[in-house]
């Protein structure tokens, strides 16, 4: 029986936890604290204190996350859109607030949000190369494993023939290469190759303004850069564990 030990030292049967990871509340809630991820690693690259804050403070830029959630559903799992609630007006409207009380904010979107996401997702799904990627693929597949003796989780947007494909939106597709480095997408690619035992990683990218669509493969140099960042992130996590009072953590160096 293959098992996985989480950051809180709880041990799960690998098969059982993968089944639980299909539930978003378990995946983002419980495992958000008790397993590392690409997003957690990016915080650790900033500092152990930045990682600590990410565990204890509410997320910012919530609208971008909402837009991304809806676009992902419409492109990858359009059948699930039928289970969402859409309302007239803004998120300040009485109708929206009542709907949130009934089914939760993650299940309620305004018609304006719907129309924006629909326009983008229809463009993505209309591209022949993207259609070929989606045909016969599996979507939103979870994985969990250890890296440098630490539990890591991940969820592949698209998994097909040993290739992990991630759907990204961007404000400027011409600058995606720069964005990929800035947002450490190389770290995500390196981690997911490890988690899924995949041999390649690609990005399907859509420009939210121009609706241009791009498909970007990852070079060996890109993956190697991600591995270096991943190793730094795990070192920072061990620093986090060894810091008696994280509020006193300081970054030290000599100029």
Residue ranges of model-derived segments:
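Short amphipathic alpha-helical face segments that pack within enzyme cores
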Residues: 70, 187-194
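Histidine- and/or cysteine-centered catalytic micro-motif in compact active-site loops
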Residues: 142-144, 163, 168-170, 206-208
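Secondary-structure boundary elements
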Residues: 129-133, 161-163, 194-200
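Metal-dependent nuclease catalytic cores that hydrolyze phosphodiester bonds in DNA/RNA
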Residues: 1-153, 250-255
